[in-house]
A protein has these predicted regions:
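Short, charged/polar "capping" segments at the starts of alpha-helices
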Residues: 80-83, 150-153, 326-332
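Sec-dependent signal peptide cleavage junction
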Residues: 18-26
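C-terminal regions of proteins
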Residues: 299-301, 306-361
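Active-site-proximal loop/helix segments of hydrolase catalytic cores
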Residues: 50-55, 61-107, 115-135, 210-315, ...
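Bacterial N-terminal signal peptides that target proteins for export
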Residues: 1-10
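Flexible, acidic/histidine-containing loops and adjacent segments that form or flank the divalent-metal
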Residues: 25-52, 106-109, 124-267, 339-361
């Protein structure tokens, strides 16, 4: 009789454990929903660029009371840091949940929200080549700016038109690997607000398409005066896609961070360049933030330092440069205006943002 009771108890325990076993082996589990906190905060990781002189990727880990939200702002070049950083994040979350033995179980999914500021290879190649197809990730949504209408009839070098090449690959990969994820494409001059697990995000679309009409003429006249047609043909598609960068501002309480993509600002004697127009349209007071990702990586000694320091950075704020050599280029310009900066050529730059403070370890 005692043996019968013993086996009945074993059978009962097995039946009770069966749902959990089935979940672990067959039903996708969101790791994000298993991470909750009473101390809301956003951890920003501007990823190391010292091994890739021109790559741009940032992770925002939004720790909320109900879940963790992972926001990927661009993704950088393929085979750079972003993909491995996300795999390591998933591994760390599993370890924190005492689930390290499930590292190879694809049912334990890390959910990602993607933002593509513009469609250049150094910003989004990792998204379509590594991150979106990865079996360990679920894409919740992709946000992107409108595509330029710049002609693709070989008037210009079409291979340099990121919207014609890399944007197409990004959308194709989304259809193949994340068919259920919504893709949000903003209209020109549109601002779009969406909630995060803590705080909120606001997207600012380019106010006009610099690839057509009078604005295309403007780009030619201002940035390529007197240049040979072959040089304009090769470089103009790059400038247009940069000028059409979408901006992103993430805020939590009184604190915020602003991403400006690769917006164009090259002339100290003009106040009507694409960067100037974005600030004028959306308003400096609306855009001003504690952390500003410097336009175009900080790749040159351009006049963007003045509007960044005087219009976009809050008092005591920090600009983030994201390319090799930026310290000697944009960094020197920022120093003229007494603006603080850090650079990812020194390694990944990490900030913790709460509703009241922004700190660096």
């Amino acid at each position: 009789m005692d043996m019968k009771r013993f086996w009945l108890c074993c059978l009962l325990l097995l039946l009770l454990a069966l749902p959990a076993l089935c979940q672990a082996e067959g039903t996708p589990v969101s790791l994000n929903d298993m991470i909750k906190t009473d101390s809301e905060r956003i951890e920003l990781r501007f990823l190391d660029s010292k091994n890739n002189a021109k790559t741009d990727a940032t992770l925002l880990l939004c720790y909320g009371k109900e879940r963790l939200e992972v926001l990927v702002v661009d993704g950088g070049l393929a085979n750079s840091r972003c993909y491995m950083e996300l795999l390591n994040l998933r591994k760390d979350l599993l370890s924190a949940l005492n689930l390290s033995d499930q590292a190879k179980n694809k049912d334990y999914q890390l959910h990602l929200t993607l933002v593509a500021t513009h469609s250049h290879k150094d910003h989004i190649a990792a998204l379509y080549s590594e991150i979106i197809p990865c079996k360990f990730f679920t894409i919740d949504a992709l946000y992107m700016p409108p595509a330029t209408a710049l002609v693709t009839d070989n008037t210009y070098d079409d291979s340099k038109n990121g919207d014609a090449i890399h944007r197409v690959r990004l959308l194709s990969t989304m259809r193949d690997s994340a068919p259920n994820a919504p893709v949000y494409t903003l209209d020109y001059a549109q601002a779009l607000i969406f909630p995060l697990a803590c705080g909120q995000a606001t997207l600012y679309a380019p106010i006009q398409d610099y690839g057509v009409g009078d604005t295309l003429t403007y780009i030619k006249n201002v940035y390529y005066p007197g240049q040979a047609d072959k040089d304009i043909r090769a470089d103009l598609p790059v400038a247009v896609v940069n000028a059409n960068s979408m901006w992103l501002r993430v805020e939590l309480g009184d604190k915020s961070v602003l991403f400006t993509g690769d917006i164009m600002k090259k002339k100290s004697d003009r106040e009507d360049e694409p960067m100037d127009r974005m600030i004028a349209h959306y308003g400096a007071e609306t855009l001003r933030s504690d952390i500003v990702k410097y336009p175009h990586h900080g790749i040159s000694r351009n006049p963007a330092a003045k509007p960044v320091s005087q219009l976009l950075l809050k008092e005591g704020g920090v600009a983030v440069l994201t390319t090799k050599g930026a310290r000697e280029k944009a960094g020197q310009m920022l120093a003229i205006y007494d603006a603080a900066f850090v650079t990812t050529e020194d390694g990944t730059q990490i900030f913790t943002m709460t509703a009241e403070s922004v700190t660096q370890p």
